[in-house]
Amino acid sequence: MSGKQSEEFKRTEKMTRMEYLFPVRFAVGWMFLDGGLRKAVLKPAKLDPNSASFVGGKLVNFLPHAGPFKGLLLMTLENRSLDVTFLTVFSYIEIIAGLFIIIGLLTRLAALGALAMSVGFAPAYWLGSTCEDEWQIGALLTAGSVTLMLTAAGRVWGLDYFLYKKLGDRPIANVPILKWIKLW
């Protein structure tokens, strides 16, 4: 095999391995997109504090196990407008992160946001206040988000390919820990 053929083979082999991450990217993105859409679009009553479907009730169940988030959560629950605002913003962040992960746009940054959401609500997953298996969903979303954040999964079958081709690697910020996390 000539040098040029060998180089092309290595590139093709690497692309194939990265293609295997597309199902992970799609599944993680869909979980976040679906979670946000179910609250904000498909059943807006979940964001209505006067509705029996209001998602804020789950936050009350989570309060005793909130750990370091207890003060913030208590402040949110005591102020109804803040509660609704938090849940609405959170829902739209889920939609944006999920959509960006699915289409492969700023995948690493979107996966970092997804990871923050997954880890932030990890105590609620482990509590399983509304479903016995929530911890499994949380664990998979955390693992999937870490995988997508550490790889360039959006560069294969995603819009990050075009950003990388035009601009090269770009860190989130030139801060020691953040320079290792690339935007695409």
Swiss-Prot record:
It is a multi-pass membrane protein. Pfam families: DoxD (PF04173). Inhibited by sulfite, metabisulfite and dithonite. It is found in: Cell membrane. Its EC number is 1.8.5.2. GO terms for cellular component: membrane; oxidoreductase complex; plasma membrane. It catalyses: 6-decylubiquinone + 2 thiosulfate = 6-decylubiquinol + tetrathionate. The keyword NAD does not apply. It comes from the Archaea. One of its GO terms (molecular function) is quinone binding. Increasing activity in the range between 20 and 92 degrees Celsius. Its main location: membrane. Keywords: Cell membrane, Electron transport, Membrane, Oxidoreductase, Quinone, Respiratory chain, Transmembrane, Transmembrane helix, Transport. The chain crosses the membrane at residues 21-38, 86-106, 109-129, 137-157. InterPro entries: DoxD, TQO_large_subunit. Optimum pH is around 5, the pH range of activity varies in tested buffers. The keyword Cell inner membrane does not apply. Heterodimer of a large and a small subunit in a 2:2 stoichiometry. TQO may associate with the terminal oxidase formed by doxBCE. TQO plays a role in sulfur oxidation and is proposed to couple sulfur oxidation to dioxygen reduction; caldariellaquinone or sulfolobus quinone seem to serve to transfer electrons to the electron transport chain terminal oxidase formed by DoxBCE. This is Thiosulfate dehydrogenase [quinone] large subunit.
